[in-house]
Amino acid sequence: MGPGLGNGPDEFRARRERDVTALLSQISYLEEEIGLLRRKVAESPRQLRLLEERLAEAEGRAAFLSERNDKLAGTLRDARDQLVTLKEEVDRLGQPPSGYGVFLTRHDDGTVDVFTGGRKLRVSVSPAVEVDVLQHGQEVMLNEAMNVVEACGFERAGDVVMLKELLEPVEGEAPRALVIGHTDEERVVHLAESLTDQPLRSGDSLLLETRSGYVYERIPKSEVEELVLEEVPDIDYGDIGGLSRQIEQIRDAVELPFLHADLFREYELRPPKGILLYGPPGCGKTLIAKAVANSLAKKVSAVKGEGQAKSYFLNIKGPELLNKYVGETERHIRLVFQRAREKAGEGTPVIVFFDEMDSIFRTRGSGVSSDVESTIVPQLLSEIDGVEGLENVIVIGASNREDMIDPAILRPGRLDVKIKIERPDAEAARDIFSKYLTTTLPLHPDDLAEHGNSREATVGGMIQRTVERMYTESEENRFLEVTYANGDKEVLYFKDFNSGAMLQNIVDRAKKMAIKERLETGAGGLRVGHLMQACVDEFKENEDLPNTTNPDDWARISGKKGERIVYIRTLISGKGAESGRAIDTATNTGQYL
């Protein structure tokens, strides 16, 4: 116990001190750990925010990369499509050229005959092309092996030829025709099926493809269509004023032979072939010709019991008929009468009206710079004589220089009836005015009041005042003084140069004045004062129109016949007009000429 017990407590204390030291070390370590943990806990929110920011940045970058990837993918797709398109274009450009041909006929074994490159070939047809629907003359496409791979349309370009006659068809072949080219050579051609359903007549213009020998289309000849105006005029005899005697003459000449052909045959009377209407300009020659066609159509339809009146009025524009090429004018004349014969063959009355007849059918040998009338006149004569066998065609010519028309045309048997359309006198002027001044027009209240508000009396008074103003031989109406070859002199008044066209123009002027007055003042209606002023304006406007350079020619056109006029002097005062002139050379003519 002595020495052993003495060492025991020391050892215990030493051990306890070591334990305490170890515990203190652990406590110190734990305290450091606690401090570290506390610092980490304090710093964790900031790190969390930093991580969240990094995460958001990563997500944004991922979205940007995804969008960029989509754009790159689209660009790659476009590049691939473009490569495919370019490859197709290269393949297409590398294909051999396709040829064209004209289908001629088909065979039972499925092959067809085509015309291509100046050769006639028998070729096969692609299954994509229906052989049965191919038409004669149709254009087809050929591949490199000369097989038909596609059906096309019909040719639309070529030479223009004139049909002479249709030939007898040959079984299994396209119809044929005889045509005349521009150099008058004749050629036999085939008709394409595009023409087989159209009525063709001699003289038609056709489109020819010269290499294949097919005609494809009927071409309207514009120059002929413009010259010939087919129409049923709506002008009635009741629309014409002041020409009752001339209308009666022309009705006797035209309507009687058409309506009573049996009586003409019984009396062995040949109906007239033609009528010449001559007289000063603007007096109704063309108007009468149109009324003839209209009246004739109504009468014939009434006799036949047909409901609708039908006739043809072939209005030939004289100067436009002329053509600078030799033979063209004669061809136009032949076509005109051919058209007339075709229409007359249907049992329909046909009026062939030549306006300004003196411009194309002058006396042969009277031409100054050409002798074109030497062939045109005989052509017309032969056509008129050819009309003899037709029952429904009559020729009407109009001219204000009948002295210049070739006498062979005017002789009996051609233009049998000659009717002069004279200038209207006072009575005729009243009749003409009544066609344009009607009771349906707006009339001024003051003028109505002067005639007891009677519209008929007001219009009648207007017409009477206007006629008196125009036809009075007063000082203000003096127009010209003419000197004849025998030395006599005569004063001509405006009434000596009136025409139906001039009377209509006066009424139109008055109506225009009434309209302007209505727009300016609000008070409307036609007044007699408007008509008086219109007369003055019409006279003044035409003061300088008479051609005093060649009085004799002027007199013929104006309708003044008899003693030869050698001198004309105008009597218009206040205009500073020159005195008259003797015969020199003709210049421009005006309305009066």
Curated annotation (Swiss-Prot):
GO terms for biological process: modification-dependent protein catabolic process; proteasomal protein catabolic process. ATPase which is responsible for recognizing, binding, unfolding and translocation of pupylated proteins into the bacterial 20S proteasome core particle. May be essential for opening the gate of the 20S proteasome via an interaction with its C-terminus, thereby allowing substrate entry and access to the site of proteolysis. Thus, the C-termini of the proteasomal ATPase may function like a 'key in a lock' to induce gate opening and therefore regulate proteolysis. Keywords: ATP-binding, Chaperone, Coiled coil, Nucleotide-binding, Proteasome. GO terms for cellular component: proteasome complex. This is Proteasome-associated ATPase. GO terms for molecular function: ATP binding; ATP hydrolysis activity. The lineage of its organism: Bacteria, Bacillati, Actinomycetota, Actinomycetes, Geodermatophilales. Consists of three main regions, an N-terminal coiled-coil domain that binds to protein Pup and functions as a docking station, an interdomain involved in ARC hexamerization, and a C-terminal ATPase domain of the AAA type. It comes from Geodermatophilus obscurus (strain ATCC 25078 / DSM 43160 / JCM 3152 / CCUG 61914 / KCC A-0152 / KCTC 9177 / NBRC 13315 / NRRL B-3577 / G-20). Belongs to the AAA ATPase family. Pathway: Protein degradation; proteasomal Pup-dependent pathway. Transmembrane segments: none annotated. It comes from the Bacteria. Residues 23-95 form a coiled coil. InterPro entries: AAA+_ATPase, AAA_ATPase_domain, ATPase_AAA_core, ATPase_AAA_CS, NA-bd_OB-fold, P-loop_NTPase, Prot_ATP_ID_OB_2nd, Prot_ATP_ID_OB_N.
